[in-house]
């Protein structure tokens, strides 16, 4: 049986930074990777060429390991559940992810670049703006 800790609120590292711009908080955690590199631009362009779920599945099957794809899918589902008000313990039990993963997703939802919010809004029928 999976045992999870229940957590509420933000990770300790974010306490006291509510006044900082979200982009600055996000940069504090993601400084070692260049999200604007030519390789990332190429990946984004490749994703934007995909037109159907079948094309997307085929590309992801070629590009990602099963574990990587499962991790990405679990993170997106965790983001959906967090945005619907589910708590860490419920998400941990349902998805089998660690509270550390849920905490990272929560941090990105609240202080990230806005990618989760855009995708979730569009999946729910909004424009994501």
Sequence positions of predicted segments:
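Short, Lys/Arg-enriched anionic-surface-contact patches
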Residues: 8, 55-74
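Residues at alpha-helix boundaries and the short loops/turns that link adjacent helices
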Residues: 50-54, 66, 85
